[in-house]
Amino acid sequence: MIKIAVPNKGSLSEAALEILKEAGYKGRGHNKSLNVVDEENGVEFFFLRPKDIAIYVAQGVLDLGITGRDLALDSRAKFNEVLALNFGGSTFRYAAPAGEEWDVAKLQGKRIATSYPNVVRDHLAANGIDAEVIRLDGAVEISIHLGVADVIADVVSTGTTLRQQGLEPFGEPIVTSEAVVIKREGEDVTADENVVLSRIRGILNARHYVMLDYNVAEEKLPNVEAVTPGLTGPTISPLAREGWVAVRVMVPRKLANQVMDSLEELGAEAILASDLRIARF
């Protein structure tokens, strides 16, 4: 039975559970158990603190884990990323009072407050900077106002919290993060584990694409195929209407409206976009 770690709370947990549910796995239910056995699919899920998941996976106690890249890096556990999940996106950055001119070189000898001390220490070491790293478990943004730190290093999603405290980020992102599936470093993905990953990829693909159906005059096929090439080419079927064909093709979701505009200009009719539930390529 495959053992998989899932975040036990927060936005990462909610999104991970949703994607696993769509992939056909048993949910956690309302009892908030620390583990759930899905006998039908041969998987046992363990609900752990996101910060601890990489440690369990690196020790070989669990086969796979879903957590944030930044959290996994801060644990300094030995792991490999096997799949990016396209949710939980953020950047990890330095920030200082707005209006002050800062760059990474000016961190020499300064106090840096953060909830990710190892990520910060590794970044400072890579840049040859000696600074004091102050670990805080939360509310990092207020530390400068209270005189605890000169700058902070924190997760930035929208930047709203920083602005509310009169702070602004500086320098390039230390880490660009998102939710990822991880495995112990040096271990290959097994056939059973690959089934899990394939199911998840199928959900991610479905979220990324829509199915487009439309009718068009056969003589215009070269023009519309240039707009909708699909992954390996469109599916084309003859219609009862002489000289016309039906076309079915997948297009990236974010481009669907622009593509439909172009098709309409080219004379296509009955243009329909449909959501996909699962899509394996």
Swiss-Prot record:
Pathway given in the UniProt record: Amino-acid biosynthesis; L-histidine biosynthesis; L-histidine from 5-phospho-alpha-D-ribose 1-diphosphate: step 1/9
Predominant place of localization: cytoplasm
Record-listed E.C. numbers: 2.4.2.17
Catalytic activity: 1-(5-phospho-beta-D-ribosyl)-ATP + diphosphate = 5-phospho-alpha-D-ribose 1-diphosphate + ATP
Assigned keywords, A-Z: Amino-acid biosynthesis, ATP-binding, Cytoplasm, Glycosyltransferase, Histidine biosynthesis, Magnesium, Metal-binding, Nucleotide-binding, Transferase
Enzyme class: transferase
Cofactor(s) annotated in UniProt: Mg(2+)
Pfam family, one: HisG
Biological process terms in GO annotation: L-histidine biosynthetic process
Family the UniProt entry places it in: Belongs to the ATP phosphoribosyltransferase family. Long subfamily.
Stated role: Catalyzes the condensation of ATP and 5-phosphoribose 1-diphosphate to form N'-(5'-phosphoribosyl)-ATP (PR-ATP). Has a crucial role in the pathway because the rate of histidine biosynthesis seems to be controlled primarily by regulation of HisG enzymatic activity.
Protein name: ATP phosphoribosyltransferase
